[in-house]
Every structure is written in structure tokens, then in C-alpha cells.
Amino acid sequence: MEFTTRTIAAQKHIALVAHDHCKQSLLDWVGTNKEQLKEHTLYATGTTGNLIQLNTGLPVKSMLSGPMGGDQQVGALISEGKIDLMIFFWDPLNAVPHDPDVKALLRLATVWNIPVATNRATADFLVNSALFKEPVQIAIPDYQRYLQDRLK
């Protein structure tokens, strides 16, 4: 696989996702980091996004709820280069009916090399990093070259 670069702008497009048992933890984290987050564009799966808006007043572009296709919608945005980083508080102790969607979402975040926090400590590191407020170059798959190679 060949790679190219993509610039993540100073104003980030951030996906916020949380499993049911982790929603309160994400809400608490968003509340604590509201000042940093208000400078960025927020996206979320359905229930999580609506809870964030109701509890913090921050504008959130909400997808469908995760089990109804919201995880896949966020994954599509990642593949299109429209999400720059993801905060995903997932529940490692309880299976969810849409586990394959969750795995696919995390796989796409890895393929497209976006920063991902799956717990509060890592999320804190991301928002407190100097890179959180600056443009950042990341390596991403060169899809055009990938497609050309496959069509030979």
C-alpha cells in the first residue's frame, strides 16, 4: 500500500461515540472539556449526540444511533476524510448487538490513521496536546494509486 498525506486543519472534525454503559462518562468528559471542544465541529452517533447537546449546549451533528447504522455513518465520514479524530468510549465488558459495526468503525479509523481515544485518559492526552489546536499532517492510504494498481 502506498501512502499520501492529508492535512488535519486546526479546527478539527471530531466524532464522539459511546456505548450505553459509557455515555455518562463521555458526557462528563465533554462537560470538562467543553471550552476546548467548542472550537471544533462535533459529530456523534444519535443518542450520544442528542445527550451531549441537551447536557452541554454544544452543537453536534448527530447520525443515527449506533445499532441503527450510526457507527457505519461515522465510519463512512472517516473514509471520506471528513472526521479528523474520534473519541469512542466503548464498553469492553459487555457485548453489543452491533459488535461487527464497532469493529468496522475502529478498523476504518486505523486504516485512515486518525487519532482515536477509547478511554478518558487517552482523550485527555488528545485534547491537551499542542497538536489539538494546530494543523497536522497525517499519512493516509493513497486510494487513487491503490485503485490503479488493482485495475491493472
Swiss-Prot record:
Superkingdom of origin organism: Bacteria
Name of this protein: Methylglyoxal synthase
Active site per database record: 71 (proton donor/acceptor)
Any Gene Ontology CC annotation: cytosol
Molecular function as annotated in GO: methylglyoxal synthase activity
Family of the protein in this entry: Belongs to the methylglyoxal synthase family.
Alphabetical list of InterPro entries matching this protein: Methylgl_synth, Methylglyoxal_synth_AS, MGS-like_dom, MGS-like_dom_sf
Native source species: Pectobacterium carotovorum subsp. carotovorum (strain PC1)
One of the GO BP terms on file: methylglyoxal biosynthetic process
SUPFAM superfamilies: Methylglyoxal synthase-like (SSF52335)
Keyword Transport found: no
Pfam name, any one: MGS
PROSITE patterns in UniProt: METHYLGLYOXAL_SYNTH, MGS
Stretches assigned to the MGS-like domain: 6-152
Keyword vocabulary terms for this entry: Lyase
Gene3D superfamilies found in the cross-reference section: Methylglyoxal synthase-like domain (3.40.50.1380)
NCBIfam families the UniProt entry points to: MGSA, PRK05234.1
Reaction catalyzed: dihydroxyacetone phosphate = methylglyoxal + phosphate
Coiled coil (UniProt feature): none
Lineage: Bacteria, Pseudomonadati, Pseudomonadota, Gammaproteobacteria, Enterobacterales
Annotated residues for binding of substrate: 19, 23, 45-48, 65-66, 98
Gene name for this UniProt entry: mgsA
Enzyme Commission designation: 4.2.3.3
EC primary class: lyase
Protein task: Catalyzes the formation of methylglyoxal from dihydroxyacetone phosphate.
Matching SMART domains: MGS (SM00851)
